[in-house]
Swiss-Prot record:
This is S-adenosylmethionine:tRNA ribosyltransferase-isomerase. It is found in: Cytoplasm. It comes from Azoarcus sp. (strain BH72). Signal peptide: none annotated. One of its GO terms (molecular function) is S-adenosylmethionine:tRNA ribosyltransferase-isomerase activity. Transfers and isomerizes the ribose moiety from AdoMet to the 7-aminomethyl group of 7-deazaguanine (preQ1-tRNA) to give epoxyqueuosine (oQ-tRNA). Its EC number is 2.4.99.17. It catalyses: 7-aminomethyl-7-carbaguanosine(34) in tRNA + S-adenosyl-L-methionine = epoxyqueuosine(34) in tRNA + adenine + L-methionine + 2 H(+). GO terms for cellular component: cytoplasm.
Length: 345
């Protein structure tokens, strides 16, 4: 079956794009999708679908205050979005300005820190921070949370808490692993009380997660690269779960991408690396049995991933139901619980 970009398009009324979080994390809705069966529930009901012995795998990345504002030496305004720190004093970043800064030029950020433009590769600039300034410290001191482009407002005080998961601990992302935003301590406690386990991976979400697919022939699309870490304890927890007949529940497409990337060359192994894995229908999943995820943008690689996991027609029907039922979409929107379909097309 040959798929094109148009196979992953759908009509979404703009008013269904959530612009702010709900008052409570777990107050969001949950669309449970198991083949042709759809069930409208609340996220607080998630533990009802988890069995004793199942294992949920979370992404513990923390969103950086990656957006900085400043000026060039010429006085022109610049907006800097740090994609990733490189060591303590360098970073890759996207820069928005009327004219791109030249290598060797200096930017003054937040009227406090002078950084040097070392060079450019594609859409990213290589920046050097002062020797007495750690990149992450500068971001936390002067930066702003980088809300997604479809949230049409500036980040506010509420986002400081709500655009981070309650278990975020490894700084490095420019976007939240949004499936994790629904979990609060009460839901986590109920999952543990049911006998479910929790394990952790880290995948630092890059700015490329918002880049559109620009080719109709999906084989020509190249994914952005993201850094991940799979701890040995997580590998062992997954092995125990499998041995005892439990299911592995990936919380979010970021957890899914980390797990499946680490299992492509053979059995799942602990370690760290980078992945540009592109998951399309026909992909053979090796780790996750279920997936907790939000609703994704039309024509996005994440919509392709969930279609690969549960089936293109299944996801198409589920999204049509979600639109008709006025679910809230994208980062601050509602959630889905999907079951893997090994015969998905």
């Amino acid at each position: 079956m040959t798929l094109s970009l148009q196979d992953f398009d759908y009509d979404l009324p703009p008013d269904l794009i959530a612009q702010a979080p709900l008052a409570e994390r777990s107050a969001s809705r949950l669309l449970v999708v198991d083949g042709d069966v759809l069930a409208d529930r609340r996220f607080v009901d998630l533990p009802d679908f988890i069995r004793p012995g199942d294992l949920l795998v979370f992404n513990d990345t923390r969103v950086l205050h990656a957006r900085l504002f400043g000026v060039k030496a010429t006085g022109g305004q610049v907006e800097v979005l740090v994609e990733r720190p490189i060591g303590a004093h360098e970073a890759l970043a996207q820069i928005r300005a009327s004219k791109s800064p030249k290598p060797g030029s200096t930017l003054r950020l937040a009227d406090a820190v002078d950084v040097t433009v070392l060079g450019r590769s594609g859409e990213f600039f290589h920046l050097r921070f002062p020797d007495d300034e750690n990149v992450v410290d500068v971001l936390e001191r002067y930066g702003k949370l980088p809300l997604p482009p479809y949230i049409q407002r500036a980040a506010g005080d509420a986002d400081e808490a709500r655009y981070q998961t309650v278990f975020a601990r490894a700084p490095g992302s420019v976007a939240a692993p949004t499936a994790g935003l629904h979990f609060d301590d009460a839901v986590l406690d109920r999952l543990r009380a049911r006998g479910a386990g929790c394990a952790w991976v880290t995948l630092h979400v890059g700015a490329g997660t918002f880049q559109p697919v620009r080719v109709d022939d999906l084989a020509q699309h190249r994914m952005h690269s993201e850094r991940y870490v799979i701890p040995q304890e997580t590998v062992e927890a997954i092995a125990r779960t499998r041995a005892n007949g439990g299911r592995v529940v990936a919380v979010g497409t970021t957890s899914m991408r980390a797990l499946e990337a680490a299992a492509q060359a053979g059995p799942l192994a602990a370690g760290s690396g980078e992945t540009d894995i592109f998951i399309l229908p026909g992909f053979r999943f090796r780790v996750a049995d279920m997936l907790v995820t939000n609703f994704h943008l039309p024509k996005s690689t994440l919509l392709m991933l969930v279609s690969a996991f549960s089936g293109t027609d299944v996801i198409r029907r589920a999204y049509a139901h979600a639109v008709a039922s006025r679910y809230r979409f994208f980062s601050y929107g509602d959630a889905m619980l999907l079951t893997r379909n090994d015969h998905a097309i």
